[in-house]
Amino acid sequence: MEPGLCSRAYLLVGGLWTAISKALFAEFLATGLYVFFGVGSVLPWPVALPSVLQIAITFNLATATAVQISWKTSGAHANPAVTLAYLVGSHISLPRAMAYIAAQLAGATAGAALLYGVTPGGIRETLGVNVVHNSTSTGQAVAVELVLTLQLVLCVFASMDGRQTLASPAAMIGTSVALGHLIGIYFTGCSMNPARSFGPAVIVGKFAVHWIFWVGPLTGAVLASLIYNFILFPDTKTVAQRLAILVGTTKVEKVVDLEPQKKESQTNSEDTECLTSPCEEAVRSFSFTLGLC
């Protein structure tokens, strides 16, 4: 074998897995911090019970922090509903979406476990688990979560779409989360994020009506993705391109172009880079097959 071929392939594999691991860790960390701070704001301290405004502001700030931390690394999903919306809109591949959701659920569980560990016993019993309040029926609860998540995902797409804005999306997405909490707390405690509901439920073992906080948000996310990507701001992807993105055989899988105004010379230099060695071609083919490239 020609000297240097496999060394270049090794570097390519290392770079690939570094990028993948960074994105997954960003989703894990962002979701964990979101759950720790957000759910921490709803704990029933006897000295002073949290107000709806306090909870909404805390979730606002937690969201903005999570987004700012991860948006240039993973796209700042931190929410299985957002990831599903991106999948439906043909912005990420199925393998990447599955990996993101796994990282988000793990991060949410870790964040809830940390919160549980640092909270006194009498206060951590329910750990902010989402439940239905004020005689709200299960059907009404699903509908509320659907609408709340729909507005959130629409805001996520609009805030992170490079065709619309180049600014950081953290503040606007945080505001959308706060809006949902100002209304949704009275109905369901406001989830809009299956991972937020999943983490605390796992730690305290309370899964009553837990399905609501998957069905409602995921349905709302799908509807929001269809509205944004096919009605409000449709793109020009063909069916073949969408299928290629779904299975991960193309790199065109982002709605967000973090640096859409790169110099033309940089683009040209990237376009002229060729992988000529057998090892490099094999690694590139492997990464496309996984849909993680």
UniProtKB/Swiss-Prot annotation:
Annotated transmembrane regions: 23-43, 52-70, 97-118, 139-159, 166-185, 211-231
Residues exposed to the Extracellular side: 44-51, 119-138, 186-189, 203-210
Record motif NPA 1, residues: 79-81
GO-annotated molecular function: ammonium channel activity; carbon dioxide transmembrane transporter activity; monoatomic anion channel activity; pH-gated chloride channel activity; water channel activity
Gene3D superfamilies: Glycerol uptake facilitator protein
Membrane topology, Cytoplasmic segments: 1-22, 71-75, 86-96, 160-165, 232-293
GO cellular component, one term: plasma membrane
Localization of this protein: Cytoplasmic vesicle membrane
Coiled coil: none
Comment field on protein domains: Aquaporins contain two tandem repeats each containing three membrane-spanning domains and a pore-forming loop with the signature motif Asn-Pro-Ala (NPA).
Stated family: Belongs to the MIP/aquaporin (TC 1.A.8) family.
Record function comment: Aquaporins form homotetrameric transmembrane channels, with each monomer independently mediating water transport across the plasma membrane along its osmotic gradient. Unlike classical aquaporins, AQP6 is an intracellular channel with selective anion permeability, particularly for nitrate, and exhibits very low water permeability. It may also facilitate the transport of gases, such as CO2 and NH4(+), as demonstrated in vitro.
Protein name listed in UniProt: Aquaporin-6
Native organism: Mus musculus
Lineage of producing organism: Eukaryota, Metazoa, Chordata, Craniata, Vertebrata
